[in-house]
Amino acid sequence: IEKEHFPALVQNDTLDGKLVAMPWFIDAGLLYYRKDLLAKHGAQPPKTWRELTETAQKIQDVERAAGNDKMWGFVWQGRAYEGLTCNALEWVASHNGGSIVDARGKITIDNPQAATAIATAAGWIDTISPEGVLNYAEEEARGVFQSGNAVFMRNWPYAWSLAQGPESVIKDRVGVSALPKGGTDGHSAATLGGSQLAVSNYSKHPQLAADLVLYLTGAQEQKRRAIQGAYNPTLIALYQDPEVLAAAPFMGALYDTFVNAVARPSTVTGIKYNQVSNEFWNAVHSVLAGKTQAQASLAQLESALKRLSRGGRHW
């Protein structure tokens, strides 16, 4: 069974050589865009964050001049919560700014590339992104995009099936691509997400529970969820399944995005990860809200993380 799933996910679910959970679905951040608006304005899906900024501003300005005063260029998750950690990690990693804490436990967030990434995002506020994005989670961003009032959106794969639903005003007008690079020297970076299923040691019916886990993580159920809900399978073979690709074409085109997604530093920071993430998203949110400058905020963040880990030596 383990060989049928992405190896990295199986490794993540293995403790002391024993498989303790089963991969259920894999997530990674994606860029959604309005195919019709890009075609109307002679634009292509952006390859860099600068291209996204320029394209979003251009289309937003022209659409507003034509009477759509609710149009915004780009919506995403800017609330001070785990979703902002995911968004900001994508910005930072795409600029070659690292992943907050490296695999050896060294704190790396205070660097020029990371500061550039966060400052770039701060420049979107009240230009191509509404000020309200500072309190957006996934559903707030999707609400604006799916109502037809945004050119671009960063979100997870689940938003695809909803945008394509019978009640959606943008049905058949949505495209999906990899997130932009942080400049010509950068690379596309998508934060890894997803879920696993396990059986509690305190279960009164461990065998029944294990059977349920195997059913829910099996090929039939993963295929159904991929087709009906755009949940990315953890089973490699389903990325070549014609019915899955017909329902969610991006799963084939963006296969490498999911395989090479950037992991949050939860493994190396262990039980302190929640504190690390909390410090990170608050530092980023402060910059986005215009309360601090990126360089100063990241320097303060690095100092806080060093205190938390005794200089990165004790996570």
Give a label for each model feature.
Residues 1-5, 64, 73, 78-81, ...:
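Short, solvent-exposed loop/beta-turn-alpha elements that line the ligand-binding surface or hinge
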Residues 11, 15-24, 29, 53-106, ...:
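Extracytoplasmic/periplasmic solute-binding protein
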Residues 36-46, 62, 98-99, 126-127, ...:
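Short helix-loop capping/hinge motifs at secondary-structure junctions, enriched
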Residues 1-28, 69-70, 84-85, 171-179, ...:
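Hinge/lid segment of periplasmic solute-binding proteins
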Residues 158-171, 182-282, 312-315:
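C-terminal lobe and pocket-closing loops
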Residues 49-54, 133-146:
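Short helix-initiation/N-cap motifs at beta->coil->alpha
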Residues 56-58, 103-135, 179:
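Glycine-centered hinge/linker elements that transmit conformational signals in sensory
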Residues 151-155:
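Paired acidic/hydrophobic, glycine-rich loop segments that form the ligand-binding mouth/hinge
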